[in-house]
Amino acid sequence: MISIFSKLKQGLSKTSGKISAGIDKIFYKKKLDAETLEELEELLISTDMGSLVAAKIIEDFKSLKFDKEVETTEIKETLANLIEQQLLESEIPFTLNENKLNVVLVCGVNGAGKTTTIGKLAAMYGMQGKKVAVAACDTFRAAAVNQLDSWVTRAKALLITGEEAADPASVAYRAVEESIKQDIDILFIDTAGRLHNKKNLMDELTKIVKVIKKVDENLPTHSVLVIDAITGQNTYNQVEHFNDATNLTGLIVTKLDGSAKAGVIVGVVQRFNLPIYFIGIGEQIEDLKIFNRHDFAKSLVGL
């Protein structure tokens, strides 16, 4: 059976291959100097880590003492440690309240893997003995409800739907009330995939939050944005706009196994101080992993 760390290394191979090969090329029979550090900074920026984060890491490199001739393994180990330090804010756990309904609002753009992620989470917590419900609030797209139904059936969870084209906020409100009646532990609210720059759709998300607060002002327990690692630089705009609409508590990053831009995780954590709750590194339910900054940093540089 493949270990979690091995699976993570495999999933991050596109980005780590780029970084590892880049370091090997930059430092082949060369020393750590202004020229090679500039090349390393450009390499980090190319993974969508962001110029500010890359510059900070390079500054930290400059403060360390190296021999004139430096081994690439030493560079990679140092880089992994410095990346891990940049991720200090990232490892806040996805905590749930005991003996009380937890409502998790899940949002994201079309194609980010939002519905699939909800299905995996429903299965994960169902296997832990939790009573799980899912509210289908993408009411204008029948295919979304069908996709969700397939996942929820596999997870043995309760699916709460509304009429086609019903007000998503009203479906969310009814789902919260129904979940309380049925002693549900976790209610995941699946929302319509939307572009972050479409104001009317973002307003709909804000309305859902306001409506469920009428049941309990402490809800939702979590507002989570699912982001696709392949998106790269546009991720920063997504996080900013969805955070404005829903006051995000954390992120889930999907499709890391298909991206050479996984450095974006480091940049997003630094810019928004939001934790990464889970990462997706494959299609199977077990491929949704709790984020571990140490393992991520090592895997990112190919160690």
Swiss-Prot record:
GO terms for molecular function: ATP hydrolysis activity; GTP binding; GTPase activity; signal recognition particle binding. One of its GO terms (cellular component) is plasma membrane. Part of the signal recognition particle protein translocation system, which is composed of SRP and FtsY. SRP is a ribonucleoprotein composed of Ffh and a 4.5S RNA molecule. Keywords: Cell inner membrane, Cell membrane, Cytoplasm, GTP-binding, Hydrolase, Membrane, Nucleotide-binding, Receptor. This is Signal recognition particle receptor FtsY. The gene is ftsY. It comes from the Bacteria. GTP binds at residues 108-115, 190-194, 254-257. Its main location: membrane. It comes from Rickettsia bellii (strain RML369-C). It is found in: Cell inner membrane; Cytoplasm. Its EC number is 3.6.5.4. Involved in targeting and insertion of nascent membrane proteins into the cytoplasmic membrane. Acts as a receptor for the complex formed by the signal recognition particle (SRP) and the ribosome-nascent chain (RNC). Interaction with SRP-RNC leads to the transfer of the RNC complex to the Sec translocase for insertion into the membrane, the hydrolysis of GTP by both Ffh and FtsY, and the dissociation of the SRP-FtsY complex into the individual components. It is a peripheral membrane protein. Belongs to the GTP-binding SRP family. FtsY subfamily. SMART domains: AAA (SM00382), SRP54 (SM00962), SRP54_N (SM00963). GO terms for biological process: SRP-dependent cotranslational protein targeting to membrane. It catalyses: GTP + H2O = GDP + phosphate + H(+).
